[in-house]
Amino acid sequence: MSYKLSIVKNKMMKRIINILILLCCIASLSSCGNSTEERSRVLKIYNWADYIDEDVLAEFPDWYKQQTGEDIRLVYQVFDINEIMLTKIERGHEDFDVVCPSGYIIERMLKKDLLLPIDRNFGRTPDYIPNVSPYIRHELNKTSQPERQTEDYAVPYMWGTAGILFNKKFITPEEASTWNILWTPKNRSKILMKDSYRDAYGTAIIYAHARELADSTVTVEQLMNDNSPQAIALAEKYLKEMKPNIAGWEADFGKEMMTKNKAWINFTWSGDAVWAIEEADAVGVELDYTVPREGSNIWYDGWVIPRYARNVKAASYFIN
């Protein structure tokens, strides 16, 4: 009996080994097929989640072929934190062809020589880039570096504000009209903060200098760009004082918690606030958004081509 069992086991083992070998061969052939695809036929996009019409992505390959006569396949990935995107490019040398960072990250990338100029030689295709709002272009150009204008390396895409999204059942518009709301004991464990180092810092430093802002002796822009040890220590102090009120640091789940009444307040971006208000309205929850009277950060996101991109041509057409 044991002899027969041994034969059966041996046959089963051989069959398993043969299956594994076959699977390895298939995987090998598959990877070979992928490796033979020319990189010039692939466009790697790295963008914020829910930040572009899916029809644009679906229609781009056909449009690109009409313009250039070349096939293109999109590889689309999303991120939710600027610094994660930057780390992948700066340290990991990821070969994304086009990404959409915020203005302050664009400035860092310019300083660190991590951007390529946008190729605006579109042949018979019209150049739409000059249609960008002059105001937004001007604001973005404030991040220019010596001998490098930001507008040669970035095209503005979206802009907005950072402010307070609040549940009107628990928070009044008057309460939400000042940054004091984030430090009010009433809101213990009821506040969601956007997982953004710059915006968290900005909120604390603006709150700390509310009197100076009211007297117009300092501007929000000056405060946001002050990274002195004294300013950092002051922001840290106020963020620690806010800690008991914080229910969590969110990148994308704020909308869900607000619509389910699990949080009353969400420090967030205006674009996310619009989505949250619409979703909450559908389930009978009334949310509103405001920028506190002390002032706030205005953000700009723009399309850029990272240094390690391998398809500058398609990236430039996509941006255009």
Go through the PLM ranges and name each one.
Residues S28-S31:
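C-terminal motif of bacterial Sec signal peptides marking the signal peptidase cleavage site
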Residues S35-K112:
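Early extracytoplasmic/lumenal segment of secretory-pathway proteins
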Residues L86, E107-W159, P173-N180:
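Hinge/lid segment of periplasmic solute-binding proteins
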Residues R91-C100, L114-L115, N187-S189, K260-T268:
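Alpha-to-beta junction loops
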Residues F170-S177, H209-T217, A309-A315:
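Short helix-loop capping/hinge motifs at secondary-structure junctions, enriched
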Residues I181-D199:
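Short loop->beta-strand "edge-of-pocket" segments that line small-molecule binding or catalytic clefts
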Residues L192-M193, A200, A204, E212-D288:
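Ligand-binding pocket segment of bilobal, Venus flytrap-like solute-binding proteins
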Residues D272, E279-N320:
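Extracytoplasmic/periplasmic substrate-recognition and gating elements
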